[in-house]
Amino acid sequence: MAGRFDPLTRTTVRGGATRVPAPTPATPNATATGGTAGTGAKTGTGARPRTATGGINGQAATGTAPRTRHYTPPGPLTLGLVLGPLRRGPHDPTFRVTPDGAVWRASQTPAGPGTLRVTARAADGTVTGEAWGPGADWLLDRLPALLGAEDDPAAFVPRHRLVHASHRSRPGLRLTRTGLVLESLIPSVLEQKVTADEAYRAWRILVRQYGTPAPGPAPDRMYAMPDARTWCRIPSWDWHKAGVDSKRSGTILRAARVAPRLEEAAGMDLPEASARLELVPGIGPWTSAETLQRSNGHPDAVTVGDLHLPGIIGFALAGDRTTDDAAMLELLAPYEGQRHRATRLILLAGLTPPRRKPRMPRTDIGRL
């Protein structure tokens, strides 16, 4: 069934399924003029005209022309699958999909905050990136890596019928690499041992309260996450109001204090990168894997210690919903070196065991 439809459930969303509308046809008043497709050229003159009174959805336009880069991927590329894992919930203030088929991201880069707008042209697959803010050049320099240029899908060989069907029906799946460790680490820590909705709410509250408004004509209420110094200055009562307990907030504070050392992991191989992150108390194999899947785009960064994942993998591959981590890793052994990609394809297939017990209850410590 995996190859016949694309379900949108909690499981497939976790696999990175994000629906991106088909791009609207280009018009003379809404086309970028800078750069040459396929060359990776950048220019500061390829502005998409905005209204004088407000950019998109009413946010004030800055009048600053974006930096622009065009990139032609070597094969099929589906923006929703490639960038979907970077979205933390449907109301993530750092990630937005607009009706014109554009994906917007606001990031805190080493050069400062930046906004990136990514669109793909249906005719030839050319991707255009437009960026604003101090981090614009940094974001455009890494646009190909963000879109999976450093990934090698050809190295993956399906070994199960379901995986083969999921793989065949998603030729545009590539593993993103953001090059930003803290950006993926902090929301992963927030997701430790709570429901996804609780973690998304905490991320949304903290980023909107302490983050930087997204530069340029970004959609309303978009923010780049706080920098490391700002994370360290968040008072305990605001963590509490966001529903974050002292264990998770303490882990984030410890990570923020050594942020430069953690960011070095973006250039390391998987074992060294995992070891670097796990030196911080409160960061274990689950959190490091969830982080490095996004920051490093490593195809073998398999998540262990997860409440639901072993049962999903076991049910999909062996019909066993009681699978534990050890049995899951045994089932994934044929995909050694590509276990993260295999896991994503299984999640995207949407085959999950029937629910037998109530959902994990939500707890809002901010009301205490």
Where does each model-flagged region fall?
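HhH-family (HhH-GPD) DNA N-glycosylase catalytic core used in base-excision repair
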Residues: 1-35, 39-368
